[in-house]
């Protein structure tokens, strides 16, 4: 019995201290991780290749796209929104939407990749969230491990959808309100969470009125319109998430609404062409078909070991050449 307790203690300690997911996710459940500890560790060629691909893509997202557009554009706009026109503020918001995605998902990709190299499987944590045609779909694709944790431990504990429609909508708002508060004791985080909660409740209400089934996908122009609306709502909420205080958020919104000045865009593009080139690349990669990513991943898996090593060396060289400052801390480290 003592030996069994010692083994359980070692197993549990290993689970809570497993470094790839320790600081910023993905949130790995004990029921998914502990059974893997009991099995003999084995790293297949596919696991090794997929791990290298994920580390490569995560480092590319974080060190090349996220850090560069943050240091050279996004931080300047958000630090002093009143110094810039509405079009500059809007581009800053678009930049932050890409920055935070590349930062969060880049860390998750690297964590999942490192775990694969060590013989462990983590679940997917980001699934092209800006492709979402509704706010409900967005939360099925964004930080999936956090979304499922909030659902299992807050939403369902509050009653979920078991106590009528009104209670379901209220539970969604309360869950997201608490999710916002978890990020920090700030009105901006509270508003960010509450806005998402209200949007989720309104979408559930709309689905109930129109008779649409859970998980039913829209198609064609209807889906394109849904993606555009959802993306801009999420960007609106990012304004509150990113800004240090409520006044800065209101200043930014005021600039976008009252002093847009679109005629400045050509000058903006000329002055920040490297930033906009990276933003365009980032969004193109994000909205590319999933089959393209799968094809590239399969190609990496088939590469010999020397090819995989050379790929990482080239990426590290590009990171060194492009960085304009020290590598920035991951955004999620502050939460």
Give residue spans per PLM region.
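Membrane-embedded transmembrane alpha-helical bundles that form the catalytic cores
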Residues: 3-7, 11-334
